[in-house]
Amino acid sequence: MCAGTMKIISPSLTNSFFRCTLRFVACLFWIGYSQGTTHVLRFGGIFESVESGPSGAEELAFRFAVNTINRNRTLLPNTTITYDTQRINLYDSFEASRKACEQLSLGVAAIFGPSHSSSANAVQSICNALGVPHIQTRWKHQVSDNKDSFYVSLYPDFSSLSRAILDLVQFFKWKTVTIAYDDSTGLIRLQELIKAPSRYNLRLKIRQLPIDTKDAKPLLKEMKRGKEFHVIFDCSHDMAAGILKQALAMGMMTEYYHYIFTTLDLFALDVEPYRYSGVNMTGFRILNIENSQVLSIIEKWSMERLQAPPKPDSGLLDGFMTTDAALMYDAVHVASVAVQQFPQMTVSSLQCNRHKPWRFGARFINLIKEAHWEGLTGRITFNKTNGLRTDFDLDVISLKEEGLEKIGTWDPTSGLNMTDNQKGKPANITDSLSNRSLIVTTILEEPYVMFKKSDKPLYGKARFEGYCIDLLEKLSRILGFEYEVRLVEDGKYGAKDDSTQQWNGMVRELMDHKADLAVAPLAITYVREQVIDFTKPFMTLGIGILYRKPNGTNPGVFSFLNPLSPDIWMYILLAYLGVSCVLFVIARFSPYEWYNPHPCNPDSDVVENNFTLLNSFWFGVGALMQQGSELMPKALSTRIVGGIWWFFTLIIISSYTANLAAFLTVERMESPIDSADDLAKQTKIEYGAVQDGATMTFFKKSRIPTYEKMWAFMNSRSQSVLVKNNEEGIQRALTSDYAFLMESTTIEFVTQRNCNLTQIGGLIDSKGYGVGTPMGSPYRDKITIAILQLQEEGVLHMMKEKWWRGNGCPEEESKEASALGVQNIGGIFIVLAAGLVLSVFVAVGEFLYKSKKNAQLEKRSFCSAMVEELRMSLKCQRRLKHKPQPPVIVKTEEVINMHTFNDRRLPGKETMA
């Protein structure tokens, strides 16, 4: 029948059947050829989920990466990647091991995931045994003797990331840091930071976040109570999102708090509610969003991700690519780069119970470790020994009003490089203060802060006026902030109680963040700088002594002696005695001071000297009293003495006369104290300061003996000498024998308006008033710049003139004249002494010269003539002496005549030939 059938078939039908058969065989051949040239590899992925539901970001990124590689065909033109994904419960290591064995039995070139350590370690041990690469995108603790040779991790090495956090802490100059971690591995990850206190001046406090719940409010409450403003949170992004929401509800999202998050997903969090809170929030980002190709891939991812159901309460922006997703995307591409280098690689089914490793596994893992790829997270290279990613770039991001912005970079080689100040837009000091409302604490103190006098009721800041109020208004105009003025509750400036170690006053309110600024006469001191910050001083001053003015005393009966000091009076008396004696001696020695008392008888051999001892004293008195004495010196030496004495008396009398009028007309103000030393040496006059003020603290902390003694006095009588405020101290200084220690600027203000008070002595110390801010306040530097601007423009000086200038007290006609001392007119005594010495030398010269002339005249030796002259000069009571005569020749008749006329003396006219 068959043959018959064959026979009845026509040739045309036979040819058609033959052609169809050939075509069918050709198709089968092409399919077989195609299957032989197209390489197919399978990747396995194990992902964790809390419960059955939508796929997580890592699983979606894994599929997205595989599909992208297969679509583009650029990386693997002749290889098709397939995948097998499995889901397990969190921390289920047994289920993870079972799923890994299932995938290995199917034949996979590598296994990606799971994320958590316990499950990852179980899968890692299986991969090590069977020689299959295990690729991780989460941090896993690596022990020093790590033997996971088939392991690579794309997550940045946390020892490097810990150094990045430490560099950031040092850049911000933090002194106290709190670390809050969510599991025990956080202490391992942050080991570089935990070791920091031993190497840096850093105080570290470590707290653990709640494990079984996301309620962090109890922990945040403890941080707020402990004033922990610098906190590092080591937690997942969903935990970070919950912490931010709870911190906002607790009032911990202010400019005084600064948070650093270790999660690399900070950029993906919804920070819209916190943009204008003023909180400082810093973190790191590894996703290279500045690359246009990366942005293109993220856009495609976002489009596909938005089609998937969003994960509830994740805290992430919908469709935003997380770091885990980006790392998984890069991990698939890195494995594909290794596949490209090993095209002949094939996979085989592996059984967990046989322990027969994959023959291509060792080479494949080495190719993965040697791979280089510029991915979504930057450059990717591995340490060939441990498979860790140690070379990477991080962007430092910070919360601004525009959102999270890049402010710097960090890499393991160069470290931290902050670029926030190098942006295109210029820095503006009003950026952090514009349109903000600040609480300002102050204290009533004239003329700084006072209640404004008005007939109408005043409210708010309009109730106050004064220097500090004007300063606050100027600052608000420059910086653009609003403010509310509140008086400090306890009425104190701020001091530390030694027994309780607690602060009070305005300092306490700043420490408790009840106020943003303290604008008052608040002195900048060392102890206050330990707990709060200060701006540069807007006023410099010191501690002075306020005391009532002493009563004036009328000039006394003997006030005419006051123009010259007692020393000068004594020196004048000694000078008078000395000059008189010198004049007497010189007049006796000088031959030219002897004269003929009978001018009509020029032949008389008797000469006379007017300068007896009494006459010499009389001559000195006459010159001193500006009167004549009828005694005129004739010799040059005596005239020198007289002239120099007259010059001396001229200066003395002129000085005395000039100073006498002041002493006779001015009421002398005699004060019992003139300085702090005078106060310390006595106990009759009480003295004190404002309790718990900067002045009291100065004496309390001083180590200068005088001030220590003063503090001992004040401390022993603290109930009576320490006052509550300046007004009480001023009133006590007016009404009792009390010296009030206070700031010099306030003393200046008080003495301008109360003429019965005055400042005693100079300043005891030097300090300044500054605007106080809480520790670490971002406003301090901005306010400092504004204060310097006001200072340079002269505004601060004009404000001081406005509030300090009063009616003024009537000026005294003249100040008390001080007695002239040796330093004033001592030179005239030197001139007097020089004149006396000169006159002595001249007198000696005259004496020698005259002795020589007499020796020649009397024809005898020079020595005998000098002795004779000296003998006659030393006869102090004699005014007469014989003139020297030449020898004469006497004739006989003249002798007879002499006997006859015995009442006449020898004329002695003839001389020997």
From Swiss-Prot:
<feature type="glycosylation site" description="N-linked (GlcNAc...) asparagine">
    <location>
        <position position="756"/>
    </location>
</feature>
<dbReference type="InterPro" id="IPR028082">
    <property type="entry name" value="Peripla_BP_I"/>
</dbReference>
<dbReference type="InterPro" id="IPR019594">
    <property type="entry name" value="Glu/Gly-bd"/>
</dbReference>
<feature type="transmembrane region" description="Helical">
    <location>
        <begin position="567"/>
        <end position="587"/>
    </location>
</feature>
<keyword id="KW-0770">Synapse</keyword>
<dbReference type="GO" id="GO:0005886">
    <property type="term" value="C:plasma membrane"/>
</dbReference>
<feature type="topological domain" description="Extracellular">
    <location>
        <begin position="1"/>
        <end position="566"/>
    </location>
</feature>
<feature type="disulfide bond">
    <location>
        <begin position="755"/>
        <end position="809"/>
    </location>
</feature>
<feature type="disulfide bond">
    <location>
        <begin position="101"/>
        <end position="352"/>
    </location>
</feature>
<feature type="binding site">
    <location>
        <position position="695"/>
    </location>
    <ligand>
        <name>L-glutamate</name>
    </ligand>
</feature>
<feature type="glycosylation site" description="N-linked (GlcNAc...) asparagine">
    <location>
        <position position="72"/>
    </location>
</feature>
<feature type="transmembrane region" description="Helical">
    <location>
        <begin position="644"/>
        <end position="664"/>
    </location>
</feature>
<dbReference type="GO" id="GO:0042734">
    <property type="term" value="C:presynaptic membrane"/>
</dbReference>
<dbReference type="GO" id="GO:0050804">
    <property type="term" value="P:modulation of chemical synaptic transmission"/>
</dbReference>
<feature type="transmembrane region" description="Helical">
    <location>
        <begin position="825"/>
        <end position="845"/>
    </location>
</feature>
<feature type="topological domain" description="Cytoplasmic">
    <location>
        <begin position="846"/>
        <end position="913"/>
    </location>
</feature>
<dbReference type="GO" id="GO:0022849">
    <property type="term" value="F:glutamate-gated calcium ion channel activity"/>
</dbReference>
<dbReference type="InterPro" id="IPR001320">
    <property type="entry name" value="Iontro_rcpt_C"/>
</dbReference>
<keyword id="KW-1071">Ligand-gated ion channel</keyword>
<dbReference type="GO" id="GO:1904315">
    <property type="term" value="F:transmitter-gated monoatomic ion channel activity involved in regulation of postsynaptic membrane potential"/>
</dbReference>
<dbReference type="Pfam" id="PF01094">
    <property type="entry name" value="ANF_receptor"/>
</dbReference>
<dbReference type="GO" id="GO:0035249">
    <property type="term" value="P:synaptic transmission, glutamatergic"/>
</dbReference>
<dbReference type="InterPro" id="IPR015683">
    <property type="entry name" value="Ionotropic_Glu_rcpt"/>
</dbReference>
<feature type="glycosylation site" description="N-linked (GlcNAc...) asparagine">
    <location>
        <position position="435"/>
    </location>
</feature>
<feature type="topological domain" description="Extracellular">
    <location>
        <begin position="665"/>
        <end position="824"/>
    </location>
</feature>
<keyword id="KW-0675">Receptor</keyword>
<feature type="binding site">
    <location>
        <position position="521"/>
    </location>
    <ligand>
        <name>L-glutamate</name>
    </ligand>
</feature>
<dbReference type="Pfam" id="PF10613">
    <property type="entry name" value="Lig_chan-Glu_bd"/>
</dbReference>
<dbReference type="GO" id="GO:0098839">
    <property type="term" value="C:postsynaptic density membrane"/>
</dbReference>
<dbReference type="GO" id="GO:0120169">
    <property type="term" value="P:detection of cold stimulus involved in thermoception"/>
</dbReference>
<keyword id="KW-0325">Glycoprotein</keyword>
<keyword id="KW-1015">Disulfide bond</keyword>
<feature type="binding site">
    <location>
        <position position="523"/>
    </location>
    <ligand>
        <name>L-glutamate</name>
    </ligand>
</feature>
<feature type="glycosylation site" description="N-linked (GlcNAc...) asparagine">
    <location>
        <position position="78"/>
    </location>
</feature>
<keyword id="KW-0406">Ion transport</keyword>
<feature type="glycosylation site" description="N-linked (GlcNAc...) asparagine">
    <location>
        <position position="280"/>
    </location>
</feature>
<keyword id="KW-0628">Postsynaptic cell membrane</keyword>
<dbReference type="InterPro" id="IPR001508">
    <property type="entry name" value="Iono_Glu_rcpt_met"/>
</dbReference>
<comment type="subunit">
    <text>Homotetramer and heterotetramer with GRIK5. Tetramers may be formed by the dimerization of dimers.</text>
</comment>
<dbReference type="InterPro" id="IPR001828">
    <property type="entry name" value="ANF_lig-bd_rcpt"/>
</dbReference>
<feature type="binding site">
    <location>
        <position position="694"/>
    </location>
    <ligand>
        <name>L-glutamate</name>
    </ligand>
</feature>
<comment type="similarity">
    <text>Belongs to the glutamate-gated ion channel (TC 1.A.10.1) family. GRIK2 subfamily.</text>
</comment>
